[in-house]
Regions:
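Terminal accessory/targeting
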Residues: 1-26, 38, 42-51, 164-230
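A broad, low-specificity signal for short, low-complexity segments enriched in glycine/proline
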Residues: 39-40, 79, 99, 129-134, ...
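Catalytic domains of cell-wall/extracellular-matrix polysaccharide-remodeling enzymes
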Residues: 62, 73, 86-192, 196-197, ...
Length: 230
């Protein structure tokens, strides 16, 4: 009986510890490419961290596809960031579907599975997009890292200051964005020291028992609300 009680208590303690684990997800927009994406993958490999890459269909070619395949093979998730990075609320329903299908089909061609998540270009939304895109919508906490005048130090400061359990970070691996590569290299050991574990966005939602909802765009998976068109 004592052994049974001890076993039950051990399971409960392990379950509690797991549920209280602080998780964050790094995600990167605007690849793939053969420069910055490669540098980012090297940094993630150095720190043994998995992340999510939201790719633009028009950026996938024979060479950049090899980088995307590397990312997938190293345990990162490949997600959808549209075909052309257009402001999608200006598009028709058919054009929206085409933007998504083009990229999803290319990702499936090269890595063997279709994206499950979608990040809208410019985080521009309307109801037509929700009605015609059968993927989970993802936003994220940014650090203005698309602006070249934002230094690596400023990016590090912003990323560290916004850290909290359940957060998705929205960063960029477009060509020439080396300051974000530097920032990520610096913030990972700091956040690990603070008790955070890095996972992909899919894994974040899985471990936090989040079932994707319609008409929701996720930044903090533990604090969500329905999107409403203004």
């Amino acid at each position: 009986m004592k052994k049974i009680i001890f076993s039950i208590l051990s399971v409960l303690m392990c379950s509690t510890a797991f549920s209280q684990n602080k998780l964050v997800a790094l995600s990167f927009d605007d690849g793939p490419n053969t420069t910055t994406t490669v540098q980012m993958l090297d940094v993630l490999k150095k720190h043994n961290v998995k992340a999510s890459f939201f790719v633009i269909g028009k950026n996938i070619n024979d060479e950049s596809a090899k980088v995307m395949v590397r990312a997938h093979n190293e345990g990162h998730d490949i997600e959808n960031h549209s075909k052309t990075h257009s402001a999608m609320p200006t598009l028709s329903a058919d054009s929206i579907k085409s933007e998504i299908e083009f990229t999803s089909a290319l990702v499936a061609k090269y890595v063997g599975e279709r994206p499950q998540l979608f990040r809208p270009p410019y985080i521009a939304l309307n109801q037509t997009m929700f009605d015609n895109i059968d993927l989970t919508f993802i936003c994220g906490e940014g650090s203005n890292d698309w602006e070249d005048n934002v230094s690596a130090d400023q990016r590090v400061e912003k990323i560290l200051a916004s850290a909290k359990d359940g957060l998705i970070y929205l960063l960029h691996d477009f060509e020439g964005n080396g300051k974000t590569v530097e920032a990520v290299d610096r913030i990972i050991p700091v956040l690990k020291e603070r008790g955070y574990t890095f996972v992909t966005v899919r894994e974040l939602m899985k471990q936090k028992n989040i079932k994707p909802q319609k008409d929701v765009i996720y930044t903090d998976v533990l604090n969500v609300s329905k999107w409403k068109e203004k």
